[in-house]
């Protein structure tokens, strides 16, 4: 399963290796709320030991929690986000992005006639968008949790949602 490729342990190791070279907030891209919850549990000890807070950021959170994640803070933050943070938000102070390379997309299964959220690899375009979140207002750094060979094999861009449905006959 594609979602088993990146574990909370991978994230913790990547964060630990990159944290010292960063002064701002870290933005970690994960595919969904479940992965965010598991990563938050794993990273809480690291964050506490480094004077930071772990904050989730996804569309199913109550507005107050989303606002807390986005609010300016003198404390360093580890923001665990879905692709909602890829293009629609500017988060001040982020200078480190850790990218799982995964996203959840709605896909139609023509065999069953059911729409399901699937965890998929992102495109090269999405990877660049995510990398651009680091250092929007200064120098930044991105850690991709996949190899250059895997990056070269990614689609150039996502198929638009309407096209995904059109290809399945919906």
Task: Pin down the residues of each PLM region.
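P-loop NTPase motor module signature
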Residues: 1-170
